[in-house]
Amino acid sequence: MGQNDLVKTLRMNYLFDFYQSLLTNKQKNYLEFFYLQDYSLSEIADTFEVSRQAVYDNIRRTGDLVEDYESKLRLYQRFEKRRELYNLMKQSLNQPELLKQYITQLEELE
């Protein structure tokens, strides 16, 4: 698995966590098996008794769908920004003015 594949898988795992409640059971199952359980297309196709192409199409469409949700709702983007600010805050505990700036930025995200 290449670096880009790993980054995409990690991103899809986060997007799945944030948006799975908006998906159908079939969409959830396919994404979970593919990205979280690391099943191959063939294994998923065998499990659900469908073609590999059907699995591939569903995963691609569902991936596009969660990316669309993210572009509109930005839950993952805000999560990443909060995580970054928390780390910066930990590093600036001895710098009150800088810490205040980070707290302000964090409050603006809410």
Swiss-Prot record:
SUPFAM superfamilies: Sigma3 and sigma4 domains of RNA polymerase sigma factors
Gene3D superfamilies recorded: Winged helix-like DNA-binding domain superfamily/Winged helix DNA-binding domain (1.10.10.10)
Family per record: Belongs to the UPF0122 family.
Function: Might take part in the signal recognition particle (SRP) pathway. This is inferred from the conservation of its genetic proximity to ftsY/ffh. May be a regulatory protein.
Protein name per its UniProtKB record: UPF0122 protein SE_0911
Organism of derivation: Staphylococcus epidermidis (strain ATCC 12228 / FDA PCI 1200)
